[in-house]
């Protein structure tokens, strides 16, 4: 990190579980960050989002794989059985800073984004707030404009899966192959390794 900085260094690994281990290690042992989220943290968007970019002419949508730097953590809230934070993020590739609501639950999740079950729970909980809306169409319209339902799903961006790293470019890339048992090296492994290198 001293040589090329946080923005130009990444660990590419095979699973979200391994990415979480690297992210926690890098945040705690190298960056000395103990809080869950702090200014300066690098985040990776885990799911396309069309809600938060709508007020910015230079942003069509925030794409899965976009990287953002936390400028400020404004407020944390527990709602609908999930943890959220209002944060100010800077997106270097988009060259825009925006205030968004993020889901903290996805930061260390072993799934790529909210699981189907979690997504359904959030959907049902937010939809319940619109009990007074009589038509299904109007409820769906409200849901599309609800900041809680449309919270940005993010992960830490220090260690990521090969899938999430695709299309990115860094000066220093560390490829973690993890433990490879005897005989586990297959064509699939070599394909993954090729993708990681390219």
Label the model's feature ranges.
Residues 1-7:
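Conserved interdomain hinge at the start of the Helicase C-terminal
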Residues 7-198:
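Core RecA-like ATPase module of SF1/SF2 helicases and allied nucleic-acid translocases
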């Amino acid at each position: 990190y001293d040589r090329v900085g946080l923005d130009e260094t990444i660990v590419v690994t095979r699973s979200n579980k391994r990415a979480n281990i690297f992210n926690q290690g890098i945040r705690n042992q190298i960056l000395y960050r103990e809080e869950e989220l702090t200014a300066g943290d690098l985040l990776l968007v885990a799911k396309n989002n069309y809600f938060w970019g709508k007020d910015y002419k230079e942003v069509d949508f925030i794409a899965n794989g976009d990287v953002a730097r936390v400028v400020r953590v404004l407020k944390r809230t527990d709602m609908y059985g999930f943890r959220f934070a209002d944060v100010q993020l800077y997106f270097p590739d988009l060259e825009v800073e925006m205030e968004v609501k993020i889901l903290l639950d996805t930061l260390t999740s072993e799934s790529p984004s909210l699981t189907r079950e979690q997504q359904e729970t959030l959907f049902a909980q937010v939809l319940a707030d619109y009990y007074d809306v009589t038509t299904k169409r109007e409820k769906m319209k409200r849901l599309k404009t609800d900041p809680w339902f449309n919270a940005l799903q993010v992960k830490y961006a220090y260690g990521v899966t090969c899938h999430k790293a695709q299309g990115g470019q860094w000066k220093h890339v560390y490829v973690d192959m993890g433990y490879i048992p005897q005989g586990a090296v297959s064509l699939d492994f070599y394909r993954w390794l090729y993708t990681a290198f390219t």
